[in-house]
Curated annotation (Swiss-Prot):
Glycosylation sites: 48, 99, 144, 161, 208, 384, 458, 480, 513, 544, 566, 574, 578, 635, 818, 885, 916, 983, 992, 996, 1008, 1029, 1043, 1052
Function: Hydrolyzes a broad range of alpha-D-linked glucopyranosides, including maltose (alpha-1,4), sucrose (alpha-1,2), isomaltose (alpha-1,6) and turanose (alpha-1,3).
InterPro entries per UniProt: Gal_mutarotase_sf_dom, Glyco_hydro_31_AS, Glyco_hydro_31_C, Glyco_hydro_31_CS, Glyco_hydro_31_TIM, Glyco_hydro_b, Glycoside_hydrolase_SF
Annotated protein name in UniProt: Alpha-glucosidase
Enzyme class: hydrolase
Secretion signal, residue range per the UniProt entry: 1-35
Similarity comment text for this entry: Belongs to the glycosyl hydrolase 31 family.
Keyword Hydrolase among UniProt keywords: yes
Pfam family, one: Glyco_hydro_31_3rd
Domain of life: Eukaryota
Phylogenetic classification of the source organism: Eukaryota, Fungi, Dikarya, Basidiomycota, Ustilaginomycotina
UniProt keyword annotations, A-Z: Glycoprotein, Glycosidase, Hydrolase, Signal, Zymogen
Length: 1070
């Protein structure tokens, strides 16, 4: 090490002494954590060989932007160029990086890559292939890329004519070739500035202001800023994971932090997932609605702000790595020598395509096993095998289908992963329970948390996964080479370095050993943001690591759904008590300004929540670490990791944690490193959960190669859908989020589950659902009734609640039991159609669940702000009840060229289209309608399990449009074989008084077709024939419904089927 000059020694020692004075008063677990940061700063200063340091200015108005240097290097698929600072460094929140490289690559006709990175490549970038593969930055190396002539999108910049144009620094913008409309524009002159911060954000200090006083591009070692102009009232969707009052982001006032956090489901904050992707819908200059997607590839914490006319990115690391997706479909798939003609001749642009193009880039979602679309049941608080078995038995006794039983952390011995409690879940009884489930064609899923208990250091305790992890050297470390220790449910814990050489081997061994004692069908991955209950390293030099007491959760829960007053009506949650309705009376504003009959106000007496995330302490009990450092940079290689100068709004509205522990709260310390001393956790924190999912997916493929892995996980990053499904986290037994400031005291309710499902279609994770009836707080009968109905028409269906809350299994209330039977039976009946949508979306990347305007852009203005209704696939319109004490709802039904049909009664909906209308919605019902011109493939006899249901013959429900036509394709496979999966496509079409079907592919359908229901048959046929033979039928004049029965038709035909195999001739009477 270069020696310190005498002149600089005194101030450096004084700074160190001051730091030690403040830290030595703290436990060793905190001061070691902080001392490492300050020593690192001193070391970097010394290496610079100078006493001169750089202090942040906290002022972006001084930032000069960049200028183009030299001539771009052109190639067939794009170009590269060099950028350098256009003036004196501003060092706003770090050290300005003087030299940057611009890479512009036309990767595909619809996909444009723009990457601005430090030429020295010192900034962290996601290694290619770590989660998903992607083209590189050098256009000369691109294989099978597109060209500027072929591209849907045009890249412009202010120096493209050889000289800098306009005022300010270098900037770029992206335009559509077909219309000339600009979709991304970084020119500061086109972007409004805001000198005041957002009114909704209480803290607007120099370190985290939400003001936007300037828009020059900033590229520093710990702060990157870039802005783009937006139209007034921009229609932005995505940028999550988030909970707010609308699927559409507020274009005038949105602050969205990005940093994976164990936080429940907070309103207007960051939470479990990290997805800096948005889809935007705009009216072009020609008045047409077009949609595109914009993705920023990064791993660092960041804030994204929306204010009127602008979107601004603020990242605390990484690079500016954008991809733009046009949302356009080419006129044909054939190649053309005239690429320009091909690009202009686009025939369609759609949100489905804009989302699909992004999902194709990060990797299409996995096809999940068929059984996973059954009903799942869980709660935190099934304390032993007997309680769990009693619930399984009660479900069957009440004839409520149960496909998958889950256990939360209750089954673990002292909350240690890969163990079972010998008293409460003894292996013999536990194995017998699971075996009985398997014998009945049911399934079992246990939870696994990310934190691994520290291997005991005494001779009386053994924890093999911890010991084996030490042997294979897979656990995250401190900078000094010691193991990093956190605290979670088991006490002292390690965390796996997911990129360690032996990480995959360790996970596979642990999962394989666990599978020999617990015969699970899938795994539930939790706490993998990752979550830790301490700030910093929990173990100091003298900590006794054998003392690992497990945490004890509280057991009392207060809080009820809006309008239910437990002080008046008790804790039953019933709709009626002694003949009286239990909702208190009182007017509350609806979304449309009208008054509803019963109050949505909540009595908040003793509103104490039991959460999976407990209060966070500093190591050994201290709450917070030292105050902010006096930021002094020696050079751009030095960083302040736990407490960078720009404080992203991590956990905003959740707690009043001081900014100096902003990033370390509730997670692994940012200074922790990989097993090789590389990869500061600051850079890889947001990847951790998805890398764990990848390890689990690969392990399950290895352990059970003939089965599809099934994972449900909490923390996600782009590409996670290739490995896992997701549930929307620890939500609340609420109808919707609470009003005003009250919203920040709780979180997502039932209404937000729709927003969440739609979000994750954009994020490429299609198996998605919420905790039905709510996780936090006590639920009640009416909320649970409505939620079970809604949950049956979302991809992932699981009822789950917290320890200490009243029980909410479907059999607990008679009306909920009845609603559950109705909803689950219908789900199982139409499961071939739902599964087809999920499988086809996995193959194509298009969303399985869609906002109405995705399919019907003519209703965009009416539906762009809300998600009160949604489409499952392109054919099932779901309109749930999302408020209490109503028997009617307002809903909008697009004009689809025929009659929408209720899938329960087959009755035609007779309403005015493209307007909000009133429809009946009695308790224990839900409005689900089949689109005209579409077909449902069904199981004819829904049963208790998915397996039993699938043994029954197929049926078809054909809803003719006004032209007497219908068409749909269905995906058939065995529901279990991993990809590449032998499958077939069944195509059903109707027209000219006939219904025809054809099947193509490798998979042979296991069941015959037994009935066909044709809707909108206005006259009674004289005969119905199939294959030249008359068939049985009945006709309902009121419903205009033809029911053809007794078919027993082989969908496969003889051998490999080609052509038409089913034909029903409808010879109608005059």
């Amino acid at each position: 090490m270069r020696s310190i000059k005498a002149a600089s020694l005194t101030p450096l020692l004084a700074a160190l002494f001051t730091t030690l004075s403040s830290t030595l008063a703290l436990p060793s677990s905190v001061w070691e954590h902080q001392l490492e940061t300050n020593v690192l700063a001193l070391r970097d200063t010394n290496n610079n060989g100078s006493s001169s340091t750089i202090s942040p200015s906290f002022d972006v108005t001084k930032c000069p932007g960049y200028k183009l240097v030299g001539q771009p290097q052109q190639s067939q698929h794009g170009f590269t160029a060099q950028l350098s600072l256009a003036g004196d460094a501003c060092n706003a929140y770090g050290v300005d990086i003087a030299n940057l490289t611009l890479s512009v690559v036309y990767e595909k006709q619809h996909q444009l890559h723009v990457h601005i990175y430090d030429t020295a490549k010192q900034q962290y970038q996601l290694p290619n292939g770590l989660i998903f593969d992607r083209p590189g930055d050098n256009p000369a190396d691109i294989q099978n890329g597109s060209t500027a002539d072929q591209s849907d999108l045009v890249f412009h910049h202010t120096a493209e004519n050889g000289t800098q144009s306009g005022n300010g620094g270098w900037a770029f913008w992206i335009a559509r070739k077909s219309s000339g409309d600009v979709i991304f524009d970084t020119r500061a002159s086109n972007i409004p500035t805001y000198n005041d911060g957002l009114s909704s954000v209480s803290s607007n200090t120099k370190r985290n202001t939400t003001a936007m006083p300037a828009h020059e591009m900033v590229f520093e070692n710990q702060y990157l800023q870039i802005s783009s102009a937006l139209p007034t009232g921009a229609n932005i969707y995505g940028l999550g994971e988030y909970v707010t009052g609308s699927f559409r982001r507020n274009p005038d006032e949105t602050l969205q932090p990005f940093f994976t956090l164990d936080a429940g489901t907070p309103v207007d904050s960051n939470m479990y997932g990290y997805h800096p992707i948005y889809t935007e819908a705009r009216r072009g200059s020609d008045g047409k609605l077009r949609t595109h997607s914009v993705h920023l590839q990064n791993t660092a914490g960041m804030d994204v702000l929306l204010r009127r006319g602008v979107i601004q990115y603020r990242a605390i690391g990484g690079t500016l790595d954008f991809r733009f997706f046009s949302g356009d479909q080419p006129a044909s798939s054939s190649s053309s020598s005239s690429g320009n003609d091909k690009a202009v001749a686009t025939v369609k642009n759609s949100p489905n395509t804009a989302i699909q193009q992004y999902v194709n880039f990060i990797g299409n979602p996995v096809i999940h096993p068929y059984w996973s679309y059954g009903f799942h049941l869980c709660r935190w608080g099934y304390n032993n095998v007997s309680e769990t078995q009693a619930v399984i038995d009660a479900m069957r006794q009440n004839n409520i289908p149960l496909e998958v039983q889950w256990n939360d952390i209750d089954y673990l011995q002292e909350f240690r992963d890969f163990t079972t409690d010998p008293q409460r879940f003894p292996q013999k009884e536990f194995a017998a329970m699971i075996a009985k489930l398997k014998d009945n064609h049911q399934h079992y899923i246990p939870i696994i948390d990310m934190a691994i208990p520290k291997a005991p250091t005494n001779d009386t305790d053994v924890y093999y996964p911890g010991t084996r992890g030490d042997e294979l050297d897979v656990f995250i470390k401190n900078r000094n080479g010691s193991q990093y220790i956190g605290e979670v449910w088991p006490g002292y814990t390690n965390f796996v370095d997911q990129q360690a050489e032996n990480a995959g081997k360790w996970w596979t061994e642990a999962i394989r050993n666990f599978s020999e004692i617990v015969d699970f069908s899938g795994i539930w991955l939790d706490m993998n943001e990752p979550s830790s209950f301490v700030i910093g390293n929990a173990a100091g030099p003298e900590t006794n690591l054998s003392n690992t007491p497990a945490y004890t959760a509280a057991t009392s829960v207060a809080g009820w759904p809006q309008g239910y007053n437990n002080l008046t009506w008790g804790t039953s949650g019933n709709i009626t008590v002694n003949g009286s309705y239990t909702y208190q009376q009182g007017p509350v504003q609806n979304n449309d300004g009208s008054k509803q009959r019963r109050s949505l106000l909540l009595s908040r007496d003793e509103d104490v929540l039991v959460q999976r995330d407990i209060n966070v302490n500093g190591g050994n009990g201290d709450k917070f670490g030292p105050e902010d450092p006096n930021y002094q940079y020696a050079n751009s290689s030095q960083r302040y990791l736990s407490n960078p100068p720009y404080a992203i709004h991590n956990g905003i509205h959740i707690s009043e944690t001081p900014l100096n522990v902003n990033l370390d709260k509730k997670t692994v310390a940012m200074e922790a490193v990989g097993v090789d001393g590389q990869r500061a956790f600051y850079d890889v924190h947001n990847l951790d959960g998805t890398l764990e999912e990848q390890h689990f997916y690969n392990a399950l493929r290895d352990i059970r190669p003939q089965e599809r892995p099934f994972l449900i996980s909490r923390s996600t990053y782009p590409g996670a859908g290739k490995f896992t499904g997701h549930w929307l986290g620890d939500n609340y037994a609420l109808w919707t989020i609470l009003p005003g400031e009250e919203a920040y005291k709780a979180g997502a309710g039932m209404a937000q589950s729709i927003d969440g499902v739609l979000q994750f279609q954009i994020f490429g994770i299609h198996l998605i659902g919420a905790d039905i009836c709510g996780f936090n707080r006590n639920s009640d009968e009416e909320l649970c009734n409505r939620w079970m109905m809604l949950g049956a028409f979302l991809p992932f269906m699981r009822n789950h609640n917290t320890i200490g809350a009243i029980a909410q299994e479907p059999f607990r209330w008679d009306s909920v039991a009845n609603a559950s039977r109705i909803a689950i039976n219908k789900r199982y009946e139409i499961l071939p159609s739902l599964y087809s949508h999920m499988a086809q979306s996995a193959e194509s990347g298009e969303p399985a669940v869609r906002a109405l305007w995705y399919e019907f852009d003519e209703v965009f203005e009416q539906t762009k702000d809300y998600a009160h209704q949604f489409l499952f696939g392109d054919d099932l319109l779901v309109s749930p009840v999302l408020e209490p004490n109503v028997t009617q709802i307002k809903a909008l039904f697009p004009n689809a060229g025929g009659k929408w049909r209720n899938v329960f009664s087959y009755e035609a909906l007779d309403v005015e289209y493209n307007k909000n209308v009133t429809v009946d919605a009695a308790l224990s019902t839900i409005n689900v309608h089949l689109r005209p011109g579409k077909v449902l493939l069904t199981h004819s006899k829904p049963a208790y399990t998915v397996y039993e249901t699938a043994q029954s013959p197929y049926g078809l429900i054909v809803n003719l449009n006004d032209q007497g036509e219908a068409k749909q394709t269905f995906y058939l496979d065995d529901g279990m074989t991993p990809a590449p999966t032998p499958n077939s496509t069944l195509t059903v079409s109707a027209g000219n008084n006939s219904v025809n079907g054809s099947i193509e592919g490798e998979y042979k359908a296991q069941q015959n077709l037994t009935y066909v229901v044709v809707l909108d048959v206005k006259q009674k046929p004289t005969q119905v024939m199939m294959g030249g033979n008359k068939t049985e039928f009945s006709w309902d004049q009121q419903k205009t419904l033809l029911n053809v029965t007794g078919l027993n038709a082989d969908l496969n035909g003889s051998g490999r089927f080609r052509g038409l195999r089913l034909e029903l001739s409808l010879l109608c009477e005059d």
